[in-house]
Amino acid sequence: MFKRMIQLTTWLVLMVCGWQVQAADEETIKVGVLHSLSGTMAISETTLKDTILMMVDEQNANGGLLGKKLEAVVVDPASDWPLFAEKARELISKEQVDVVFGCWTSVSRKSVLPVFEELDSLLFYPVQYEGEESSKNVFYTGAAPNQQAIPAVDYLMNDIGAERWVLAGTDYVYPRTTNKILEAYLKAKGVADADIMINYTPFGHSDWQSIVAD
């Protein structure tokens, strides 16, 4: 049911936001897929690519959209943040896609944002993010910290009785911004500095033994 709601919302947005104008004279409506198929983020983003292709096939089996078939155009930004921007420009300018579904990390989203705003194209961003950003060219489908992280802290504090906290994450914008918000929230709730541990690791880190031991 949830997948159907997302699918319906997606196609409705395509219809009402004006992207059908570009598609009117084309044989297909092009959907850009900007997810890493190689590198560190491939384990997460490949699944999103597969999901988009499945939804495109399902929609085409149901007659397409606006009387036209959808055509997925897939590129691989390879978990390389500057390459995300290059591939976004390629999809919009060269491939002439009508909309793009892509990114996972906030650093990749921030890398492509100037491209989407410059070329006035639309990005569907699929996961939670740290907030503190809004653009008419991005459809943010995930939760911000006040919708996800803060309620989790409230549950752990009030229902589980957690007293000591570890704010861990990969060393980039989403964990750092979210943890900054959480740290301030915990302190406002009376948690002492000594009971808050903050730790960041690089992408691809796999040795968690020392962190757990601490």
Task: Show the residue positions of the predicted features.
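Short, low-complexity disordered leader/linker segments with a strong preference
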Residues: 1-30
